[in-house]
């Protein structure tokens, strides 16, 4: 049997959310632009948003980082108990996003086996980093995950698939 590092997962998606306020960029973006994140806070204020469930890494050095992490965990608990999410058990989800130039990019939401991952430069593992990992950011990421009732991964896996046999065939099954 062929094994793969990519697997199905129990996936939570917001139901009845204003997606213009729900979706935010990954926590490791705009790390030198606190004004970007301040604008996102203004835009999402009072709304259910993924922003309330992540720790933007621009705040990693702040004195109140532990308080922010505690708030993230509380928000996760309340979103789950309030029924904000629809759960898709043992699933993979086909997604499309339209870039600003109009090009549509397709992908699959799933899980990777972290035992197959190695972020070190030159790694030959099944799953490896395409950009340098900032090792100093790992401890706070672990702190956010420890005791958290939900995971909000922010990675994108690129697949070497010259035959276009992984993602492209799924387009015909949209909506199933």
How should each PLM-predicted stretch be described?
Residues 2-176:
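A cross-family signal for N-terminal binding/gating loops and helix N-caps
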């Amino acid at each position: 049997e062929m094994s793969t590092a990519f697997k199905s997962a129990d996936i939570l998606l917001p139901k009845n959310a204003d997606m213009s306020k729900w979706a935010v960029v990954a926590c490791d973006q705009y790390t030198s632009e606190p004004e970007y994140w301040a604008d996102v806070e203004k835009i999402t204020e009072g709304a259910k948003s993924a922003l309330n469930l992540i720790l933007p890494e621009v705040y990693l050095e702040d004195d109140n980082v532990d308080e922010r992490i505690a708030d993230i965990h509380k928000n996760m608990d309340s979103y789950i108990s309030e029924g904000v999410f629809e759960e898709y058990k043992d699933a993979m989800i086909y997604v499309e996003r339209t870039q600003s130039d109009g090009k549509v990019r397709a992908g699959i939401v799933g899980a990777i086996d972290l035992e197959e991952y190695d972020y070190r430069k030159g790694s030959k593992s099944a799953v490896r980093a395409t950009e340098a990992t900032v090792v100093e950011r790992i401890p706070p990421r672990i702190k956010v995950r420890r005791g958290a009732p939900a995971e909000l991964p922010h990675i994108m896996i690129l697949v070497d698939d010259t035959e276009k046999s992984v993602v492209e065939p799924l387009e015909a099954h949209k909506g199933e």
